[in-house]
Amino acid sequence: MICYVLVAYILFAYMCVLQKETPLANAAFWAARKGNLALLQLLLNSGRVVIDCKDSYGTSALMVASYSGHYDCVRELIMQGADINLQRETGSTALFFAAQQGHDDIVKLLFEFGASTEFQAKDGGTALCAACQSGHSKVVEMLLKNGANIHDQLSDGATPLFLASQEGHVTIVRQLLSSGAKVNQPREDGTTPLWIAAQMGHSEVVKVLLLRGADRDADRNDGSTALFKAAHNGHCNVIEELLKFSPSLGLLKNGSTALHAAVMGGDPKTVILLLKANADPTLRNKNNDLPGDLTKNERILRILRPQILNGGS
């Protein structure tokens, strides 16, 4: 025991000068972060450490232990009276951190002692948003069973489904859709889950979203569609999935076509895919440019020339 106290004072005395916290409080944070249960118990039982003491960012020892995945330390802090739903300055709670890191055992423990799914970070993020973005399907399942709102939104309008689609977490996408997530719910800038999945090249997510009724031609505020972005970024697998649902190959609200985007992207394979789907190389964009006017790539020009001579047929 004497050894633990000496370690605590030596390691953290200098930290209190920087953070204006007591050495013992800093030692408790260190023990929670490292999973040193014996030291944590010693410090808490000394009566000289406030159970919900915070660092300069409002982080508590329970949040630290939850983030780091130390089940026994989390349980000890809870049993000694730590506030489970205490919020950091950013609005995050212990549940948020455990969900973000995929510590399903700690998420379960926090729920057993009354953790709430309703708290939001300053950007609107919830524990469900964090788990979906990070790809922790088991945690997502637990959160949904314990009342997490599947329609939560970040300040920019992104939903849990949007975040999972953006990161390519197809299992979570399926979970959310099966639990009632709105497949076409856009972000404030008009970006839908399908659009973002297509841009990022997540073909399996695109496939699932389309099969569950995603609008293949939903456009963002700038007029671009999922096919337009996939074509521009050269995501052939995504293009193939989208073409199965007959998306628009004509002029979009942005005054351009997917073929224009493919040509600008510079990948001959995407150009070939669109031409085989009957994209018209004779359509001009809002600047009166043909797709072929937008490149000096000889491979692409050789692909386009016969089509143009044949009138796009």
Where are these regions (language model features)?
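Ankyrin-repeat-protein effector appendages
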Residues: 3-6, 10-28, 146, 179, ...
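Conserved ankyrin/ankyrin-like repeat signature
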Residues: 39, 72-73, 105-106, 138-139, ...
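Ankyrin-repeat junction/capping positions
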Residues: 52, 85, 118, 151, ...
